[in-house]
């Protein structure tokens, strides 16, 4: 049986972490691509030399030619400029849109049948542009956002309640920015909603609100601490969970930036919503009901993404 092939576009901090995790989880063979020649080859060799110690048999290759991603089953895109202190995700549009064009052409030529996961920021706009540039069917391309944002929320909740992260479920929807929507009503500890835990005295509404706000600012918190880049361990782990659900047909329900065609009242955009990822890519969009406050937050988040997409169209008229 042929082994899966995973192509990683961008051999920076996230790309290298993705490559290692793909091997540790035995997801397939890995091609690391980067335009800076030597970097993908060096990281690929370094991780390949870790394989005998960790006991996995994935084959690794590094490349600076898109031909190397030929017939990849999964393509994960991290290429682009990361955030630096003081930058918003939106500040990255001009630079990273050009990167998405080059990546999109590479995917269209060499791996048109791949399941594509975009991590590049500003996420919701970049996955939209990448789909346009690559021509990949909308059910075969998603953005990594909600899994990461939900993981951050779960971590904060587990710390507050002093329980295992395994027993904490959290859903963060909307755009991957400061207007994201952490849904406390749909978030639970061992099936008990957070709203009930407040009533039971496990925490206070003020503490819960603070955790929601910290989740929204989670990426910026790490950017400010690192000072030279942005998060990479948790984003990589999140994308690997998505890739694994596709490659192994696990049909996990994961919050991702997915193409909406009328669901949630949104059409023609990628927005963070719960989806089922299986062998056919995005197999289902789960539509949850909002109360008035949640609907207002979600609509505000969608408006922010709409603004980013309009900005993209302003930069590249071919996207209009």
UniProtKB/Swiss-Prot annotation:
The active site is at residue 176. SUPFAM superfamilies: LDH C-terminal domain-like, NAD(P)-binding Rossmann-fold domains. The keyword Magnesium does not apply. InterPro entries: L-lactate/malate_DH (IPR001557), Lactate/malate_DH_C (IPR022383), Lactate/malate_DH_N (IPR001236), Lactate_DH/Glyco_Ohase_4_C (IPR015955), Malate_DH_type3 (IPR011275), NAD(P)-bd_dom_sf (IPR036291). It catalyses: (S)-malate + NAD(+) = oxaloacetate + NADH + H(+). Substrate binds at residues 83, 89, 121, 152. Its EC number is 1.1.1.37. It comes from the Bacteria. Keywords: NAD, Oxidoreductase, Tricarboxylic acid cycle. NAD(+) binds at residues 10-15, 34, 96, 119-121. It is an enzyme of class 1 (oxidoreductase). One of its GO terms (biological process) is tricarboxylic acid cycle. One of its GO terms (molecular function) is L-malate dehydrogenase (NAD+) activity. NCBIfam families: MalateDH_bact, PRK06223.1. Belongs to the LDH/MDH superfamily. MDH type 3 family. Catalyzes the reversible oxidation of malate to oxaloacetate. This is Malate dehydrogenase.
């Amino acid at each position: 049986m042929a082994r899966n092939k995973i192509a990683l576009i961008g051999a920076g901090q996230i790309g290298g972490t993705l490559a290692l995790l793909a091997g540790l989880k035995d997801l397939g063979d890995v091609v690391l691509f980067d335009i800076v020649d030597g970097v993908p080859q060096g990281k690929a060799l370094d991780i390949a030399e870790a394989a005998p110690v960790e006991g996995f048999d994935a084959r690794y290759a590094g490349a600076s030619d898109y031909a190397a991603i030929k017939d990849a089953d999964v393509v994960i895109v991290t290429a682009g400029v990361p955030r630096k202190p003081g930058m918003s995700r939106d500040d990255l549009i001009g630079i990273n849109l050009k990167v998405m064009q080059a990546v999109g052409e590479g995917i269209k030529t060499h791996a048109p049948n791949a399941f594509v996961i975009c991590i590049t920021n500003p996420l919701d706009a970049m996955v939209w542009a990448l789909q346009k540039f690559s021509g990949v069917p909308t059910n075969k391309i998603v953005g990594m956002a909600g899994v990461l944002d939900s993981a951050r929320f779960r971590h904060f909740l587990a710390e507050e309640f002093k329980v295992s992260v395994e027993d904490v479920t959290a859903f963060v929807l909307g755009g991957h920015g400061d207007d994201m929507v952490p849904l406390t009503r749909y978030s639970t500890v061992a099936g008990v909603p957070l709203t009930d835990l407040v009533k039971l005295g496990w925490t206070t509404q003020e503490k819960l609100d603070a955790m929601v706000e910290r989740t929204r600012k989670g990426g910026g918190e790490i950017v400010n601490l690192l000072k030279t880049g942005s998060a990479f361990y948790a984003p990589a782990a999140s994308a690997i969970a998505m890739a694994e659900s596709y490659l192994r047909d696990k049909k996990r329900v994961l919050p991702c930036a997915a193409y909406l065609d009328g669901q949630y009242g949104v059409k023609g955009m990628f927005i963070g919503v719960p989806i089922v990822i299986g062998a056919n890519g995005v197999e289902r969009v789960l539509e949850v009901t909002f109360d008035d406050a949640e609907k207002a937050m979600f609509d505000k988040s969608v408006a922010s993404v709409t603004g980013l997409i309009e900005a993209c169209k302003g930069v590249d008229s071919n996207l209009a």
